[in-house]
Amino acid sequence: MSTKQKILDEALTLFAEKGYDGTGVDLIAERVGIKGPSLYKHYKGKEEILNALIDVAEERYDEMFGSEKNIGKIPKDREEFIKVTMERISFTMRDPMIRKIRMLLVQEQFRNERISEVTTRHQLDGIQRMFAKIIKGMMDEGIIKNDDPELLAVELTAPAVLQIAKSDRQPQCEEECMEYIEKHMRHFCKVYMKERG
């Protein structure tokens, strides 16, 4: 692993544990095993490290979870919808990098405008728009009953977002949270999906 990557990894762990303001460049360098001034050969400072972390996490999240612009293929039936959605949720709950980024975002969302925007996109607006597109596609295929896809996306995603937040605060509840999310998804499908899959 390159020194530049080690800096990002250690900075992410420290930012998640101590917050952005509670983490100094010298502490990051110490964790990496280099002197503070050596860190500046790789990054201009702490803000550039933070921005690089957000960029890397956004790319990983888009690739593994999806986004409004990358919804993946439209599920063809109830079980595929549940399977794909639960895989996405499992990724977001269990991926160590994404979990640390989320902890950082939650702590820093009130102090940093970019972090505030990223947090809103991943926990509210973006995820709802993504699922509205998926739900609309499933409506167009005759899988989900015609309704307001944006409202259905809120109904689908809000409980999952709350359970993910609970799991972050209480990691011992992770399995319980996953079970609740799946139970909610099955209820959602029972209410809104047509009886064919």
Language model segments and positions:
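Hydrophobic/aromatic residues within well-ordered alpha-helical segments
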Residues: 46, 53, 57-61, 85, ...
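Hydrophobic alpha-helical connector segments
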Residues: 52, 66-99, 150-156, 197
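Hydrophobic/aromatic-rich alpha-helical bundle segments in the mid-to-C-terminal region
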Residues: 117, 121, 135-187, 197
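Amphipathic alpha-helical packing segments from all-alpha helical-bundle domains
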Residues: 94, 100, 106, 113-140
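Short alpha-helical elements of helix-turn-helix
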Residues: 5, 9, 103
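Helix-turn-helix
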Residues: 6, 14-56
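Helix-loop "lid/cap" segments that line or gate small-molecule binding pockets
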Residues: 86-94, 102-110, 188-192
